[in-house]
A protein has these predicted regions:
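Short, solvent-exposed recognition patches
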Residues: 27-111, 115-116, 120
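Functionally constrained cores in energy, signaling, and assembly domains
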Residues: 15, 76, 135-137
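Membrane-interface helical sensory segment of bacterial ECF anti-sigma factor regulators
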Residues: 1-26
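Surface-exposed amphipathic alpha-helical segments
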Residues: 117, 125-144
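Compositionally biased, low-hydrophobicity segments enriched in charged and small polar residues
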Residues: 1, 39-42, 139-140
């Protein structure tokens, strides 16, 4: 029997007008005040090239584009930050690695948001990248 405990992260969903805000519950004590480990996704679909990369102490974001103008975006955020989903989009709750995850789609995009218990991760892309987006948690690695 292990004497260690994994932190439990519960989420609160608040509806405000046309959006739903999702954030860690009030009882969650953040493990980080800044991003200490940067993550990236690998195995980007063929034809996509790096378009931009932004990084600061609270989040980072990488965007790839292909010749058709389709985009694929990966971001990492502190778990203490919240995010919002427009209520007009179809949102499904999933479970990834024992944590709640949120998958939503619109007319021409798909987005998956999940956590590892320390950070939020989001993969967003145009509809042609939907298959990759659903498998994104299996392509995440720590950046060297």
């Amino acid at each position: 029997v292990s004497a260690t405990r994994e932190p439990i992260v519960n989420f609160i969903m608040n509806k405000f007008g046309g959006t739903t805000e999702i954030k860690a519950s009030e009882s969650y004590i953040p493990t980080h005040k800044t991003i200490e480990k940067n993550y990236i996704i690998t195995d980007i679909p063929e034809g996509y090239a790096l378009y931009s990369y932004e990084e600061n102490e609270h989040d980072n974001m990488t965007v790839w584009k292909n010749a058709n103008g389709s985009i694929l975006e990966f971001s990492q955020n502190l778990l203490s930050l919240s995010f919002s989903i427009d209520n007009k989009f179809n949102c499904k709750k999933l479970e990834i690695n024992g944590y709640e995850a949120f998958y939503y789609t619109g007319e021409n995009f798909a987005c998956l948001v999940w956590t590892d218990g320390e950070y939020w991760f989001k993969v967003y892309g145009t509809a042609d990248a939907e298959d990759y987006i659903m498998t994104a948690p299996y392509h995440i690695i720590e950046k060297n």
